[in-house]
Curated annotation (Swiss-Prot):
Any one GO biological process: protein targeting
HAMAP family: SecA
EC code(s) of this entry: 7.4.2.8
Binding site residues for ATP: 143, 161-165, 661
Similarity comment: family membership: Belongs to the SecA family.
Protein known as: Protein translocase subunit SecA
Reactions listed under catalytic activity: ATP + H2O + cellular proteinSide 1 = ADP + phosphate + cellular proteinSide 2
UniProt-listed InterPro entries: Helicase_ATP-bd, Helicase_C-like, P-loop_NTPase, SEC_C_motif, SecA, SecA_CS, SecA_DEAD, SecA_motor_DEAD
Disulfide feature: none
Provenance organism: Chlorobium luteolum (strain DSM 273 / BCRC 81028 / 2530)
Membrane topology note: Peripheral membrane protein
Leading EC class: translocase
Protein origin, superkingdom: Bacteria
């Protein structure tokens, strides 16, 4: 029906492009007038455009500067300060409106200038990433359309090879004229550096400065790069700098400017694929014990080996049962036990491809799940541990606990969690136990619970490391470190770690150094970071499949840009084989055939392991080829440059799927162009489309096909049932291949299922983070004000006014003058001695005024006694140190709350609503503590004696060293294959750090390790 209306009225994208066409005509008209000008005259035209922008914005900037000067006046009243702040907010809105209007006016002129600059640069020879390059780009009309779409804050979907990098220069150049800084966001450091060097001539011609942020840069260098008119960098680097700036001790330590305009290259990769996990700055946990995984690793290795022997016996039993004419039900049970015990067993995955086997397992599983009481425990009881691969969970069985207790020579109860509620209730109900003894017994119950829960957690994480995570697939080991491989790009992710102790478990498994535990110091999700920008735009070749998510989460519209030349690439239906071995043999044979013909071929793989397997097979056939994967990425540019030459064979992970331009060599067009051979379907259709898009660029010929087997991860977990039944009905034998559009559609349905589940994960993550994001904005705004304001006196006195009102009101209700005196003395170091009769007779307001006048007089005397500069430093220190300390504690408390909130669902309560309420209560408490402690410090702090200055300087030096130890992590969630049952990624559903063992002494404000939920100082810390 939709297609019928589109034929009559035209599609949305056609209408979008039609609206822009008059602007394109105007740009081309203006460009024609620029051609006769000299280079200097063209530069002068650009300066005129810049002057128009400055002329529009300078009056507003001048008004704003005057208002900020008034705010710094020490004598300003609270009412005047509030009024001025409101005026500043209104001016900020006016500034954005004026900016948008003036840029819209000069857009045709600016784009014409950029187009003519590109024309003048033709033939210019320069260096890009150490290789000689010649400028040969002038924007086509379709590229001008893409540039207009980007400037308007939308997503420009352009087919691969249509020159997105050049398109980005148009809106970047235009918005750089404001001098506010434009950020070009790429997916990795290589592309950031390459694009900066590649596009620099256009900007350099007109004196527009261009910088790039790289992972290795120091803060001083980063600041210089951010001061440029245009800055290239990765989403992680921009995000981590934002977090670090909000932990800075002085304004000089901050590196970023305001967030004005960001253009995100490969926007689907950054805003969707990367959005399931937050950016986290973490610091070391003091006194953390890293030996716990090494201690239990030998037990787990033996347990895993025992499970392997057990599943091997089940497989032998199943193979016997499958020989019968009618499959034995016991064979189905044996196979189900293998699925639950060792789902990645190679013998098992081969059996799955046999006719009727997958259906037998599904029927058996349904039988055991059918009853309300679920008999799945009967299946699992024969195993040492049960694996749910889709949910990424592992449960130790009674048999496994028995095995571990014998190995460790410990009571099997040590591997069971005590029922805390029941045991505490029993202690409370026992009247024969004295009150002091009850406290001791409860403490023992809490201690046992904390100890055992930590041990069981570590066992589960080690079992996951051995059962669900494979070296050279999910991760690689390089230079004695476990490095995660990005499932979407195939690149190594330096600095990224699995959370909740899983990374340490993998380090123990691989016998490399186990890094220390960390705690969250600052965090933000990708979604909420990019919402900081006043204007956001993006470009990619594959956005339409996620258009609804882009609009729902980011309010970004997607506009499909027509190609400059028609796409002539031939996309063939998938070729489906029963086993991986058959598939790999077929791939090797196809590559050999193509090389003999001379047609270049790019073999796309989803993991390092597969790329190396295929490489070995091609070497055995003496086929010369290049390999590009996370282990061998140094020659990336060279390998990509050679991939389009006649007879070239390139095996690459998803690294070659984005941002790479494979140019065809001489004679290749006549051979059919580049041949794309996908060795497996990815969980995302977009990644597959990106791979196909390496061929057929700019009207070039090309071909693409995917080779799929029923043992592939996607097929095994989500899509194989229907395909297997079709193959069974058709009576396919080993080695046969099935090729049909129905099969291809079935595979795409499986991909859609995974994409929907991933969207649910991202949406849920965002719903939870939105709660923390509102709190983060309040805290970071306060902190930045504290950092940037010359004077904080008005803020301190504002806090004092509130303090006087609330404190007097609290004690006036009880008429307790002594308590009021004691509190004021303790918190402000002021002697306030109101007359008892006056206190009872007068109202709250007069008494609060008396306290305020007394405190204000004290503070003014302090300002006179202490040098101005030192007084300002005291105020700054009071604001910043208190915010930092309490915000870290708050993040820990939020982590703890988030970890257990899903259990509320068992009480018929919505976990999200419960989380919002609890988080709000914690935040109100946080603000109260921050305000009170800030005020108290501002009143109590005095300059130190010269003899103590050296000690304080040493303390500052130690704090700076600790800051260096902070680690930037983009926490890894993995794919939907490793998601929790409730659709949340494992690394997000769990706490960022495991329970700390009781021999690691917690801080006074840390949560007590006994599990009571109280702070340590209010629980077991009292005894200490």
């Amino acid at each position: 029906m939709l297609k019928f209306f589109e034929k009559i009225f035209g599609s949305k994208h056609e209408k979008d492009v039609k609206k822009i066409q008059p602007v394109i005509d105007r740009i081309n008209e203006l460009h024609a007038a620029l051609v006769p000008l000299s280079d200097d005259e063209l530069r002068a035209r650009c300066m005129e455009l810049k002057a128009r922008v400055r002329k529009t914005l300078e009056p507003i900037e001048s008004k704003r500067s005057d208002l900020y000067l008034k705010l710094d006046d020490a004598a300003i009243s609270l009412e005047d300060a509030d009024r001025i702040n409101e005026e500043i907010d209104e001016l900020a809105k006016e500034y954005e409106t004026a900016t948008a209007a003036v840029l819209e006016e000069i857009l045709p002129d600016t784009y014409a200038v950029v187009k003519d600059t590109c024309r003048r640069l033709k033939g210019h020879v320069y260096t890009v990433m150490g290789r000689e390059a010649t400028w040969d780009m002038v924007p086509y009309d379709v590229q001008l359309i893409g540039g207009i779409v980007l400037h308007s804050g939308k997503i420009s979907e352009m087919a691969t090879g249509e020159g997105k990098t050049l398109v980005s220069t148009l809106p970047t150049f235009l918005n750089a004229l404001t001098g506010r800084g434009v950020h070009l966001v790429t997916v990795n450091d290589y592309l950031a550096q390459r694009d900066k060097e590649w596009m620099n001539p256009v900007f350099e011609f007109h004196g527009i400065s261009v910088g790039v942020i790289l992972n290795t840069m120091r803060p001083e260098e980063r600041r210089r790069q951010y001061q440029c008119d245009v800055t290239y960098g990765t989403n992680n680097e921009f995000g981590f700098d934002y977090l670090r700036d909000n932990m800075a001790g002085t304004e000089d330590e901050m590196v970023q400017r305001d967030f004005y305009f960001a253009i995100v290259d490969e926007v689907d990769s950054v805003l969707i694929d990367e959005a399931r996990t937050p950016l986290i700055i973490s610091g070391p946990v003091p006194n953390a014990d890293n030996s716990k995984f090494e201690e239990i690793r030998p037990w787990i290795e033996q347990l895993v080996r025992a499970q392997q022997h057990l599943t091997a016996s089940f497989l032998s039993e199943a193979e016997k049962g499958l020989k019968n004419e009618k499959p034995d039900p016991e064979a189905g049970l044996a196979l189900l036990r293998v699925k639950r015990g060792q789902p990645k067993n190679s013998r098992y995955t081969k059996l799955l491809a046999q006719q009727g086997v997958a259906k037998l397992i599904q029927t058996t599983e349904n039988e055991y799940l059918r009853d309300k009481s679920s008999r799945m425990h009967e299946v699992d009881d024969e195993l040492y541990f049960a694996v749910d691969e889709k949910a990424s969970t592992i449960d130790l069985t009674d048999k496994g606990r028995e095995f571990l207790s014998k190995l460790s020579h410990q009571d099997r109860d040590l591997f069971l969690l005590p029922d805390v509620g029941t045991e505490i209730a029993a202690i409370d109900a026992d009247s024969s136990i004295a009150a002091p003894d009850k406290i001791m017994r409860k403490d023992e119950v809490y201690r046992l619970f904390a100890e055992r829960s930590e041990r069981l957690h570590n066992i589960a994480q080690l079992l996951k490391a051995y059962s669900l995570f494979t070296k050279d697939d999910e991760y690689v080991v390089q230079n004695g470190q476990v490095m995660i491989v990005d499932e979407f790009t195939g690149r190594i992710l330096p600095g990224r770690r699995y959370s909740d102790g899983l990374h340490q478990a993998i380090e123990a498994k691989e016998n490399v150094k186990i890094e220390g535990e960390t705690q969250t110091m600052a965090t933000v999700t990708i979604q909420n970071f990019f919402r900081l920008y006043k204007k956001l735009a993006g470009m990619t070749g594959t956005a339409e499949t996620e258009a609804s998510e882009f609009y729902e989460i980011y309010k970004l519209d997607v506009v499909a840009i027509p190609t400059n030349r028609p796409i002539v690439r031939r996309d063939m239906d998938d070729l489906v084989y029963k086993t991986r071995r058959e598939k790999y043999n077929a791939i090797a044979a196809k590559v050999e055939e193509l090389q003999k013909k001379g047609q270049p071929v790019l073999v796309g793989t989803t993991s390092v392991e597969v790329s190396e397997t295929l490489s070995r097979m091609l070497r055995a056939k003496r086929i010369t080829h290049n390999v590009l994967n996370a282990k061998q990425n140094e020659r990336e540019a060279e390998i990509v440059a050679e991939a389009g030459r006649q007879g070239a064979v390139t095996i690459a992970t998803n690294m070659a799927g984005r941002g790479t331009d494979i140019k065809l060599g001489e004679g290749v067009r006549d051979l059919g162009g580049l041949f794309i051979l996908g060795s497996e379907r990815h969980e995302s259709r977009r990644i597959d489309r990106q791979l196909r898009g390496r061929a057929g660029r700019q009207g070039d010929p090309g071909e693409s096909v995917f080779f799929v087997s029923l043992e592939d991860e996607l097929m095994r977990l989500f899509g194989s049932d229907r395909v297997i039944s079709v193959m069974d009905r058709l009576g396919h034998e080993e080695g046969d291949v099935i090729e049909h559009s129905m099969i291809t559609k079935s595979i795409e349905r499986a991909q859609k299922k995974v994409e929907e589940q991933n969207f649910a994960i991202r949406k849920r993550l965002l719903e939870y983070d939105d709660v923390l994001n509102q709190q983060r904005e309040v805290i970071y705004t306060r902190r930045r004000d504290g950092l940037k304001k010359e004077r904080l006196t008005s803020d301190i006195l504002d806090l004092l006014r509130d303090y006087c009102d609330t404190t007097v009101e609290k004690h006036h209700k009880t008429h307790d003058v002594d308590a009021l005196e004691e509190q004021v003395l303790r918190e402000l170091s002021i002697e306030f001695k109101p007359d008892r009769e006056t206190f009872e007779r007068e109202g709250i307001a007069p008494m609060a005024d008396s306290l305020y006048d007394l405190a204000l007089a004290f503070y003014r005397r302090k300002e006179e006694a202490v040098p101005e500069e030192i007084m300002r430093q005291i105020e700054k220190y009071a604001v910043l140190s208190v915010i930092d300390k309490h915000w870290r504690e708050h993040l820990r408390e939020i982590d703890t709350l988030r970890e257990g909130i899903n259990l509320r669902a068992y009480g018929q309560k919505d976990p999200l609503l419960e989380y919002k309420q609890e988080a709000y209560n914690l935040f109100i408490l946080l603000l109260h503590e921050i305000e009170l402690e800030t005020l108290s410090l501002a009143f109590k702090l005095f300059p130190v004696h010269p003899d103590e200055a050296g000690e304080i300087e040493e303390r500052r030096r130690r704090a700076a060293i600790q800051q260096e130890k902070l680690m930037a992590q983009h926490e890894e969630a993995g794919s939907v294959y490793n998601a929790q049952p409730d659709g949340e990624p494992e690394s997000q559903a769990s706490k960022q750090q495991p329970v700390v063992a009781d021999h690691s002494k917690p801080g006074r404000n840390d949560l007590c390790p006994c599990g009571s939920g109280k702070k340590y100082k209010n629980c077991h810390g009292r005894e200490a």
